[in-house]
C-alpha cells in the first residue's frame, strides 16, 4: 500500500448516495472536440446527416488513423465551432437503434488474441480515444507502444462515485478489459485502487496497487509518480475504469458500450446520487428538475478541474465521471475576512470552522477575493504529495519558463494534478491552463 499524507479532501456538501439510479431520458448527446488535447478534425459528417451508433463523425488530421465515432444512433443537428474554427461540439439528436457492429469473442479467448487485432478493433470503434498518454495527455498514435498502462480504478475527487460500486456491477466486462490491456502493452498494466475487493485479471502482467490518503491519491499522475515516473523517453498510458468496462463490452458483445454512470452531486442538487446516462449526454436534460432554484453553475467533471457546461459545451465530457452543481457566488461580503467564519472553510485554518471536525460546507463559485500576487505561504506544499517543489514549479508556470518548469517535473503533470494548487492559491491563479501552455511549447520544440 502507498499512503499519501499530503493533499486535501474538500469538505463540500451534497455528497452522493452510492446507489446507482436511472437518470433522466436523454434526447441529445455530443462529442466535445476541445476535450481532446491538440486534436484538429477532418469532418466526416455534416448537419442533417443520419448516423449509426459507432459511425465515424470526424478524424484527427494531426494524429493519422485516430477516429471519433458516434455514441448513439441519430441525426447530426449541430456542429459548433469557436474562435479560429476550433471544433467545440458535434451534437446528435438521438433517434433509432441502428449501429455498426464489430467482432465478438468469448471471455476465455481475449488474452490469446493478436495485439494488432485488438488495436484495430479499438481504433475502428473509436474506443482507442479513451487512452491518454503521459506526458501531454493526448490520444496515443496508432503505431505507438508503451511499457505501462495505468487503470485508474478509484476516484478521490470531491463528490466522486465509488469506483468499487460501479465495477462490481460489471465484473466480467472489467476483467475482459484488463485482459485486452494486458495484450495491448505486453508489459505492465497497473490497476490502481483503494482498499477493497475488485475483480482481478488472471494475466501475469496485470498488477494491483493500493493507494490510500486524501485527494489527489486517486489521480493517474500520482500513481505514475510512485510506480512509473514518466518523461519524454518513458511514456505511459492511462485509462479510466469505466472505459476499461467499455473495452470489455465491445469485445464480448461486438457493440459499442456508451453507458456512463456519473455522480450527480453538489450543494445545489436536490437528491445527490449516482445516475446512469450516456457518454456525451446533454447536462441540461440530465439535471432537469434535479437542481435547487436559483442561479447555479453546472460542471462536467470535478469541481476542482471540470468544465462549465453551457452553450455548445453543455454536455458530459468524454473523460468525466461527475456532474457537479454549485450556486453562483455573486454576493459580496463586507469585511468577510474579519468574521469568525463558523460556516466558512479555510485551508489555512483562518476561520472558526476548523474546530468543528466533519462539517460540510455549501460552497459556491466565488473565489473569495480578487486577483493578487502569488504568495508562497506553504499552501501548495500542504496539498502536493509528489516529490517536487510546487512553489518553484508554479512560479515558473506563471513566468512561462519552459526549461525550468520541465526540470521541476512539469512533464509528469496534467491539469488535474494542479487542481488543488489552484484551489488553495492566495493569488487566485489558474495553473491548469498555464501548465498546458508549457506542455504545448515543450512538445512543439521537441
From Swiss-Prot:
It catalyses: a ubiquinone + n Na(+)(in) + NADH + H(+) = a ubiquinol + n Na(+)(out) + NAD(+). InterPro entries: NqrA, NQRA_2nd, NqrA_C_domain, NQRA_N. One of its GO terms (molecular function) is oxidoreductase activity, acting on NAD(P)H, quinone or similar compound as acceptor. Composed of six subunits; NqrA, NqrB, NqrC, NqrD, NqrE and NqrF. Belongs to the NqrA family. NQR complex catalyzes the reduction of ubiquinone-1 to ubiquinol by two successive reactions, coupled with the transport of Na(+) ions from the cytoplasm to the periplasm. NqrA to NqrE are probably involved in the second step, the conversion of ubisemiquinone to ubiquinol. This is Na(+)-translocating NADH-quinone reductase subunit A. The lineage of its organism: Bacteria, Pseudomonadati, Pseudomonadota, Gammaproteobacteria, Vibrionales. The gene is nqrA.
Amino acid at each position: 500500500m502507498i499512503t499519501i499524507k499530503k493533499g486535501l479532501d474538500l469538505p463540500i456538501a451534497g455528497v452522493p448516495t452510492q446507489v446507482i439510479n436511472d437518470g433522466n431520458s436523454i434526447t441529445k448527446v455530443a462529442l466535445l472536440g476541445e476535450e481532446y488535447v491538440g486534436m484538429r478534425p477532418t469532418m466526416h459528417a455534416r448537419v442533417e446527416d443520419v448516423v449509426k451508433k459507432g459511425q465515424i463523425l470526424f478524424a484527427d488530421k494531426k494524429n493519422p488513423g485516430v477516429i471519433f465515432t458516434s455514441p448513439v444512433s441519430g441525426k447530426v443537428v449541430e456542429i459548433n465551432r469557436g474562435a479560429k474554427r476550433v471544433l467545440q461540439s458535434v451534437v446528435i439528436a438521438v433517434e433509432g437503434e441502428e449501429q455498426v457492429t464489430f467482432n465478438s469473442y468469448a471471455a476465455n479467448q481475449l488474452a490469446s488474441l493478436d495485439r494488432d487485432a485488438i488495436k484495430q478493433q479499438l481504433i475502428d470503434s473509436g474506443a482507442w480515444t479513451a487512452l491518454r498518454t503521459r506526458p501531454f495527455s493526448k490520444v496515443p498514435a496508432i503505431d505507438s507502444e508503451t511499457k505501462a498502462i495505468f487503470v485508474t480504478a478509484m476516484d478521490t475527487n470531491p463528490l466522486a462515485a465509488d469506483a468499487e460500486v460501479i465495477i462490481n456491477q460489471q465484473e466480467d466486462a472489467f476483467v475482459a478489459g484488463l485482459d485486452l490491456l494486458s495484450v495491448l502493452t505486453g508489459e505492465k498494466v497497473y490497476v490502481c485502487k483503494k482498499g477493497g475487493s475488485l475483480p482481478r485479471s488472471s494475466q501475469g502482467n496485470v498488477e494491483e496497487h493500493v493507494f490510500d490518503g486524501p485527494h489527489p491519491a486517486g489521480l493517474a499522475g500520482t500513481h505514475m509518480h510512485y510506480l512509473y515516473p514518466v518523461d519524454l523517453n518513458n511514456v505511459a498510458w492511462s485509462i479510466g475504469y469505466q472505459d476499461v468496462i467499455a473495452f470489455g463490452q465491445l469485445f464480448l458483445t461486438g457493440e459499442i458500450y456508451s453507458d456512463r454512470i456519473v455522480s450527480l452531486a453538489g450543494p445545489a442538487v436536490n437528491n445527490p446520487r449516482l445516475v446512469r446516462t450516456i457518454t456525451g449526454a446533454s447536462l441540461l436534460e440530465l439535471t432537469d428538475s434535479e437542481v435547487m432554484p436559483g442561479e447555479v453553475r453546472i460542471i462536467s467533471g470535478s469541481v476542482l478541474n471540470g468544465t462549465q457546461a453551457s452553450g455548445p459545451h453543455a454536455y458530459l465530457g468524454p473523460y468525466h465521471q461527475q456532474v457537479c452543481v454549485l450556486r453562483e457566488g455573486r454576493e459580496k461580503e463586507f469585511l468577510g475576512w474579519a468574521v469568525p467564519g463558523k460556516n466558512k472553510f479555510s485551508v489555512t485554518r483562518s476561520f472558526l470552522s476548523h474546530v468543528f471536525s466533519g462539517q460540510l460546507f455549501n460552497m459556491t463559485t466565488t473565489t473569495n477575493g480578487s486577483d493578487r500576487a502569488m504568495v508562497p505561504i506553504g499552501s501548495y506544499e500542504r496539498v502536493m504529495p509528489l516529490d517536487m517543489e510546487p512553489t518553484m514549479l508554479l512560479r515558473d508556470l506563471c513566468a512561462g519558463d519552459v526549461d525550468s518548469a520541465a526540470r521541476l517535473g512539469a512533464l509528469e503533470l496534467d491539469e488535474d494534478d494542479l487542481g488543488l494548487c489552484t484551489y488553495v492559491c492566495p493569488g487566485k491563479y489558474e495553473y491548469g491552463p498555464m501548465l498546458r501552455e508549457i506542455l504545448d511549447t515543450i512538445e512543439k520544440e521537441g
